[in-house]
């Protein structure tokens, strides 16, 4: 039984590009390439190309659409360049090129390249067709081939190129010398009609084709339904009561009805219908063939204009022997002439042929499934059928009475007829007019007779039978028996078992509508977007039309295990027959695999795999087409016979999908889970080897394709050219950026000058520098350790000036190996040259400046120290920063052997070689560093406490002296003119 969705068909938008190409290119070998990825990789190849080239589909996937993998030493380089230019310029072109098959056999191909556009008029694919023209390129006449060898070669060439010759034959005229190159290119030229767009679109109907579910056709069907009931009621009435023989008005009405039914026949030749798989058939040829095989003959017989044919007959003589048109008339006792009897017989024949119009009820039968899914409509139709049967039997009951009331032998009225008894009961008896017309007159009227007939048939069909109208003659009794038999059957079937009929006939319909209502309520409750809602509804309708509401799992559970396995093998027979991986499987192995397979139906737009999702299934495409999308680009198009997923039998881990797999059309997939497949392969070891060797995935979702988009390459090229053509940036001399760089350059030059001065001072201070030079040079190829030394004088109590001078000269005089005295914006290392505010600032800021020294600055002069190790030696003394420097040294040199020189400050400037040491020695070294670090931290805390006391003493002296001075002097002390002021504040005081 067809559901509402099945009656309408599957009308969701779908991408039928691949199906259109395959259907229109039955004898063409072609590949499809992505036009938006570098090298235009192949995303689909048909079976013809695989047979022609010798490659498997999985082997050519992701290779260049230019088929560079088929080039060889004899391939023309100029033609290859032209092919590349055609791809780059998105042009349509054709070439003749020599390529090589997989077995390296050279073959001449005629290649046609055509761009495919999407709904945005953007080229997204390339269609490349290949035709073997080797027979036309190789000369038949060859000196090496003579006699039968030449004939065999000619026969082989003609046989291999029979399809091309059949195309060329109609266009070749006798006596013409046709150029093979141009003629072949012209014949194999693809027109624009064979290049559909790559986009999703609703099913299109050709011109002059009407959709069977459109508003116009629905309205027309209702009109036909009403006229069909009109015909079913009036045709039996007119035939039985012999009315409208000469009534022109009714003749015109019946003729109009006949014309409408003839128009309906014409429309049926141009109306779509739903195919067995739920698809909408819009091909005009298929529509016509389907209608001619089904309802055409019946519709044609029911539409013949019998009234018009009967009107052209000579019925004037017949009317002279008929009674009053308003009453029931009978023939005169005088027999009519022979011509009148012949005319009356012909007229009665055509009047009886009107009954053929009842075949129009077939139109109701074919559309009955449109309405019987609703309970109220079914009840109304059943009541109408019962009433229509009573109407037909009433007409037959009157015809029997009209035939029985007149005795042909005695030319008298039979008083045992039910019409005679009815005439007596209602007071209108029959009378013979002997003086006038000489006919029988009187009797009941037409309306009274019809109502009485309908009353009798109704009481008989319902088995009531009041008995006021009863059969008297033998024919009437036989018909009464037939009425009672038919009535009992109709009554018991229609009225006695209505509930049972509904439960048995419409159980699936009720479940279907219950499911639809539940889905609609769910979508409405959670406010699912309209687009997604339509996809859900379309999927449910399409799935129901495919399964007809049958629960496959429930049916299989009823069957025993052996029978269930046989059914599963039958359901998956397409997968087992089409793929060579299952050819060596035993019956037991196939049955085990079939039990694990699942059939999945996908609607257009459904995502089978999302990027990043676990690939836990192996999918076989049985029907439909899908696309594989990676980074918003189509990298493969999968069709019937393709396999995608992951090679579970070779990988130990569960893979993540690197792309999205989306259905383009309605698809049927046969899916087997990873665990189930591995379980079967582990049990059937022999089959597992054959399976892993012969099963080739069309697309492996585990592997990610690395590609570059042409748009990205072009954008990078444009940016590079733009930077190349840009004018250089010219800054004026007084620009802030230029001034900033000049300042950095000056500071760097000053720092380098200070380094050179510091090295000269260090050479004078080091006592054993020259003695150690030779020892250091001897070991310069090994690992070196440099130690940062700091000078510091013993801490002694001094006065304010002495403390200040000592702090500037000793505490803040920190040296890095081979570097200058560190300080903010230091130009000279001699603190005696600074005055006033600058001297006080240096005294307070030296500790912070040492922490700001970066490791990169300390390592800048490392190559120079390596070349002249004796120039950068410094003395190691105790200071507040020595602990930190010492700890850094130890941590940097963890794992190296410590020598006595490392522990002695005197030999710190000597560079030593270090070698790997055992783990225990390393642990001892780390512990020693830890203890030394603790001691250094304690010394640092003591020194910080001493510094705080000195600072508090300085603040106390400043406050005491500030209170004795005037406000003008106080302001001068608190706000000096500049850091480099020559005025010595402390000296002035």
Curated annotation (Swiss-Prot):
UniProt entry tagged with the keyword Membrane: yes
Effect of residue 628 to A/L: Mildly increases the affinity for CALM
Extracellular topological domain: 242-248, 310-345, 400-448, 471-477
Segments forming domain PAS: 14-94
Lineage: Eukaryota, Metazoa, Chordata, Craniata, Vertebrata
One of the protein's GO biological processes: regulation of presynaptic cytosolic calcium ion concentration
One GO cellular component term noted in the UniProt record for this chain: plasma membrane
Assigned protein family: Belongs to the potassium channel family. H (Eag) (TC 1.A.1.20) subfamily. Kv10.1/KCNH1 sub-subfamily.
Compositionally biased tracts (Basic and acidic residues): 857-879, 887-901, 980-989
Region called CAD (involved in subunit assembly), residue ranges: 924-964
Chain residue ranges for the region called Required for phosphatidylinositol bisphosphate binding: 151-162
Positions on the Cytoplasmic side per record topology: 1-220, 270-290, 369-377, 499-989
Posttranslational mods: Channel activity is regulated via tyrosine phosphorylation/dephosphorylation by SRC and PTPN6.
Modified residues (Phosphoserine): 974, 978, 981
Organism expressing this protein natively: Mus musculus
Protein name per its UniProtKB record: Voltage-gated delayed rectifier potassium channel KCNH1
């Amino acid at each position: 039984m067809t559901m509402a969705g099945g009656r309408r068909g599957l009308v969701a938008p779908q991408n039928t590009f691949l199906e259109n190409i395959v259907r229109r290119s039955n004898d063409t070998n072609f590949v499809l390439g992505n036009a938006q990825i570098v090298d235009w990789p192949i995303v689909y190849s048909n079976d013809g190309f695989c047979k022609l080239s010798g490659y498997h589909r999985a082997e050519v996937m992701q290779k260049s659409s230019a088929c560079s993998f088929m080039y060889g030493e004899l391939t023309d380089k100029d033609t290859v360049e032209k092919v590349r230019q055609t791809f780059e310029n998105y042009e349509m072109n054709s070439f003749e090129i020599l390529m090589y098959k997989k077995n390296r056999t050279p073959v001449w191909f005629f290649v046609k390249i055509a761009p495919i556009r999407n709904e945005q008029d953007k080229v997204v694919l390339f269609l490349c067709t290949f035709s073997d023209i080797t027979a036309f390129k190789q000369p038949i006449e060859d000196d090496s081939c003579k006699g039968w060898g030449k004939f065999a070669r000619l026969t082989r060439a003609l046989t291999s190129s029979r399809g091309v010759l059949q195309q060329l034959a109609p266009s070749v005229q006798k006596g013409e010398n046709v150029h093979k190159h141009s003629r072949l290119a012209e014949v194999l030229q693809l027109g624009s009609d064979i290049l559909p767009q790559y986009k999703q679109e609703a099913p299109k109907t050709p011109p002059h084709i009407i959709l069977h579910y459109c508003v116009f056709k629905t309205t027309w069907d209702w009109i036909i339904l009403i006229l069909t009931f009109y015909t079913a009621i009036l045709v039996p009435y007119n035939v039985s009561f012999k009315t409208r023989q000469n009534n022109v008005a009714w003749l015109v009405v019946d003729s109009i009805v006949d014309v409408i039914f003839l128009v309906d026949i014409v429309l049926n030749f141009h109306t779509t219908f739903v195919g067995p798989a739920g698809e909408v058939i819009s091909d005009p040829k298929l529509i016509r063939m389907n209608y001619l095989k089904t309802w055409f003959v019946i519709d044609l017989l029911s539409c013949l204009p019998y009234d018009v044919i009967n009107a052209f007959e000579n019925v004037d003589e017949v009317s002279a022997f008929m009674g009053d048109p308003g009453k029931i008339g009978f023939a005169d006792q005088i027999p009519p002439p022979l011509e009148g009897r012949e005319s009356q017989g012909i007229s009665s024949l055509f009047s009886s042929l009107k009954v053929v119009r009842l075949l129009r009820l077939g139109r109701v039968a074919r559309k009955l499934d449109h309405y019987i899914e609703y309970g109220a409509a079914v009840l109304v139709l059943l009541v109408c059928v019962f009433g229509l049967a009573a109407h037909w039997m009433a007409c037959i009951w009157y015809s029997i009475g009209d035939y029985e009331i007149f005795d042909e032998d005695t030319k008298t009225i039979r008083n045992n007829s039910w019409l005679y008894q009815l005439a007596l009961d209602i007071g209108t008896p029959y009378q013979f007019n002997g003086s006038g017309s000489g006919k029988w007159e009187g009797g009941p009227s037409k309306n009274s007779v019809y109502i009485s007939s309908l009353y009798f048939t109704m009481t008989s069909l319902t088995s009531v039978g009041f008995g006021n109208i009863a059969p008297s003659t033998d024919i009437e009794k036989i018909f009464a028996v037939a009425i009672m038999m038919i009535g009992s059957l109709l009554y018991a079937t229609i009225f006695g078992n209505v509930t049972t009929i509904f439960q048995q006939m419409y159980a699936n319909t009720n479940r279907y509508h219950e499911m639809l209502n539940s889905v609609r309520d769910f979508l409405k409750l959670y406010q699912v977007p309209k687009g997604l809602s339509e996809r859900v509804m379309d999927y449910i309708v399409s799935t129901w039309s495919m399964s007809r509401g049958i629960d496959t799992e429930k049916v299989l559970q009823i069957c025993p295990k052996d029978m269930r396995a046989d059914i599963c093998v039958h359901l998956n027979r397409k997968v087992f027959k089409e793929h060579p991986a299952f050819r060596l499987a035993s019956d037991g192995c196939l049955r085990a695999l079939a039990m694990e397979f699942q059939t999945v139906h996908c609607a257009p737009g459904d995502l089978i795999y999302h990027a990043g999702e676990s690939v836990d299934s192996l999918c076989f495409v049985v029907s439909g087409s899908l696309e594989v999308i990676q980074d918003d680009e189509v990298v493969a198009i999968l069709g019937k016979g393709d396999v995608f997923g992951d090679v579970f039998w070779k990988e130990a881990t569960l893979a993540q999908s690197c792309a999205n797999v989306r259905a383009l059309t309605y698809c049927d997939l046969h899916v087997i889970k990873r665990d189930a497949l591995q379980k079967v392969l582990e049990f059937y070891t022999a089959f597992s080897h054959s399976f892993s060797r012969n099963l080739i995935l069309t697309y492996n979702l585990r592997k990610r394709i690395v590609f570059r988009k042409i748009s990205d390459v072009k954008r990078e090229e444009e940016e590079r050219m733009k930077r190349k053509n840009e004018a250089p940036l010219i800054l004026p001399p007084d620009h802030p950026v230029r001034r900033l760089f000049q300042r950095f350059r000056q500071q760097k030059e000053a720092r380098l000058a200070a380094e050179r001065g510091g090295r000269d001072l260090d050479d004078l201070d080091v006592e054993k520098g020259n003695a150690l030079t030779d020892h250091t040079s001897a070991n310069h190829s090994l690992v070196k350790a440099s130690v940062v030394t700091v000078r510091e004088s013993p801490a002694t109590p001094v006065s304010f000036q002495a403390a200040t001078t000592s702090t500037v000269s000793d505490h803040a005089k920190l040296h890095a190996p081979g570097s200058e005295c560190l300080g903010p914006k230091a130009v000279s290392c001699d603190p005696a040259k600074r005055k006033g505010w600058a001297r006080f600032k240096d005294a307070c800021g030296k500790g912070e400046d040492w922490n700001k020294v970066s490791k990169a600055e300390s390592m800048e002069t490392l190559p120079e120290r390596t070349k002249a190790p004796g120039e950068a030696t410094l003395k190691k003394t105790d200071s507040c920063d020595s602990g930190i420097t010492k700890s850094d040294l130890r941590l940097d040199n963890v794992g190296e052997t410590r020598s006595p020189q490392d522990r002695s400050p005197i030999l710190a400037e000597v560079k030593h070689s270090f070698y790997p040491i055992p783990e225990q020695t390393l642990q001892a070294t780390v512990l020693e560093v830890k203890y030394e670090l603790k001691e250094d931290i304690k010394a640092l805390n003591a020194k910080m406490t001493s510094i705080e006391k000195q600072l508090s003493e300085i603040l106390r002296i400043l406050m005491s002296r500030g209170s004795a001075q005037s406000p003008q002097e106080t302001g001068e002390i608190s706000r000096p003119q500049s850091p480099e002021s020559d005025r010595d504040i402390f000296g002035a005081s």
